Amino acid sequence: MKFFISLITTSLLFFSGSLLAGSHAKTIMLSTKGPGAGNPFWASVEAGAKDAAEELGVNLIILSPPQESDVMAQVAQIEDQIAKGVDGIAIAPTDPNAVAPILDDAMAS
């Protein structure tokens, strides 16, 4: 679990280093596989991400589907945040094949 939290923190550091070049605070979306409140693992991931975002001055949006198996909800959340113009996305995909095309399009734009 500490490895995954470190990975999220490192991702936030990477994104903040490349994104904070502008004058306004950047927004990063963290999409987890399932609800953090009911799962100690994801609750720890969320807590670590919030701490890192606060330390780095990054706006953090944490979203997860209502159920870990709800692929379409995660896809809709990602598409919504991309449409809103988030500056970065850190994701634990529910189904990597379902989100890959969306993320490829986001990186290309």
Tell me what each language-model feature is:
Residues 16-18:
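N-terminal signal peptide c-region/cleavage motif recognized by signal peptidases
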Residues 1-2, 109:
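Short intrinsically disordered, low-complexity coil segments enriched in acidic
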Residues 2-10:
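Sec-dependent signal peptide recognition
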Residues 20-109:
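A residue-level marker of the well-folded mature domains of exported/periplasmic proteins
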